[in-house]
């Protein structure tokens, strides 16, 4: 029982006493579960003031620019760890020992192959299909091939499904790209890192093997780390909602991919790149900045600011550093990259952007990095999904471990009252 109480008075009647729950960090939460028995519900479109669950995985303080995974700051994880170690931490709650890490890495590495019949499913899609459409379909179809791990009430089944998803997602993502450009699939190699293996499957061809550049490999690894989890966002909430019905893990992750595909969620870095293409040249920047400052103009600078972070996005600091490392390594000369760098300079120095805290966010820099690496914008959200899979799995697993009720939101009904029906159609 909570020590602190909140009182809600309805129409001047006796106050309803509600528990106030306190977490380890963050805002207090009023427990409203008893309100339904009083004949009222709360109204919170978008759930911006609603804690939909209890979780121990990720903490965000948007005002202070803090992001913690299992208590570890994201900047420390991005600079001092690697993606697979972060995966272990998200899934298990603690840092791995060397032995635990080696075993985890080996298990992931040995399950990167996908069933050969799955490769034939790609041919059921048009080659000009958006890669996210293909990812939704292929991921959901995994349940038809790996039905020996679909019992969500069995902890061992959940663990097997988690490893399969984490292991096979880079393979499927790279195959989406290869299929879209008409090149043969490249199979995974067990001698490469998680990020290096993905890059090899993306860019290697039978006639020209791909040599993994360590700078680009590390950059990709950081992109994966920085997108691994972000608390109860739209796609994670979608995974939890789907999972609350007892749906199998592959279906739940496919649902998360579908939610992530939305331009307001996972498509932000692709949208930022399209904005740079619209600006097209450094000489056009002043005009677009003027438009961005005009509240009556529909133009918005994409890749700046964040719904949660009212301070600098803690992921953006590491991503900015990585971005400059990649551009220096590649010596890339590109008009859009020049536009991006000038926009960054303006945003970090212009009083308007500073006052409104419209700093470049992680999507702004990740889009630049991926473009410089030769990855098309249509693949940006696929890579986001690949990175976020571990976060989705962690939340899905936590939900099942803690016990859950099927999600069933209520509504504020504003339609017709009851009325009689008499058809005007001749039958």
UniProtKB/Swiss-Prot annotation:
This is Citrate synthase. Changing residue 208 to A: Weakened NADH binding and inhibition. It catalyses: oxaloacetate + acetyl-CoA + H2O = citrate + CoA + H(+). It is an enzyme of class 2 (transferase). NCBIfam families: cit_synth_I, PRK05614.1. The keyword Lipid metabolism does not apply. It comes from the Bacteria. InterPro entries: Citrate_synth-like_lrg_a-sub, Citrate_synth-like_sm_a-sub, Citrate_synthase, Citrate_synthase_AS, Citrate_synthase_bac-typ, Citrate_synthase_sf, Citrate_synthase_typ-I. Homohexamer. One of its GO terms (cellular component) is cytosol. Keywords: Acetylation, Allosteric enzyme, Transferase, Tricarboxylic acid cycle. GO terms for biological process: protein hexamerization; tricarboxylic acid cycle. The active site is at residues 306, 363. Belongs to the citrate synthase family. PROSITE patterns: CITRATE_SYNTHASE. It comes from Escherichia coli (strain K12). Allosterically inhibited by NADH.
